[in-house]
């Protein structure tokens, strides 16, 4: 992971935790071009995600309907989501809370052999 400053939010992107401002979605990503993806949001209460498993179950129903395989299972998505919340806890105001979001796109819509490093689904938490 790149150097992290104490005031930067952390995200999980395609298998790695990184500063949120370093998450880069290619401009040819199908979610950007066509809205071809799914998302869900879970609110926290006192820093704890509310009904996260239920949100993730609903999210995976959407992914199955869209026939997008994010490459990780629901249990991993829950664990990574909880870890994102934990890694950002020090930034939460005393009376504040978060929304933790899961976003999955079908991936890059490559034209020809352009050499994209990642052509599978893009997963962001």
Model-derived segments and their meaning:
Residues 1-125:
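Conserved alpha/beta cores of soluble small-molecule-handling proteins
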């Amino acid at each position: 992971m790149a150097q992290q400053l104490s005031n930067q939010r952390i995200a999980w992107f395609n298998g790695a935790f990184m500063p949120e401002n370093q998450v880069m979605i290619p401009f040819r990503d199908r979610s950007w071009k066509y809205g071809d993806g799914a998302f869900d949001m879970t609110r926290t209460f006192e820093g704890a995600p509310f009904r996260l498993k239920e949100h993730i179950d609903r999210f995976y129903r959407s992914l199955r309907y869209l026939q997008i395989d994010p490459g990780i299972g629901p249990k991993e998505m829950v664990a990574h989501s909880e870890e994102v919340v934990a890694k950002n806890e020090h930034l939460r105001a005393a009376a504040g809370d978060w929304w933790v979001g899961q976003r999955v796109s079908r991936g890059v819509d490559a034209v020809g052999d352009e050499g994209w490093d990642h052509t599978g689904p893009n997963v962001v938490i």
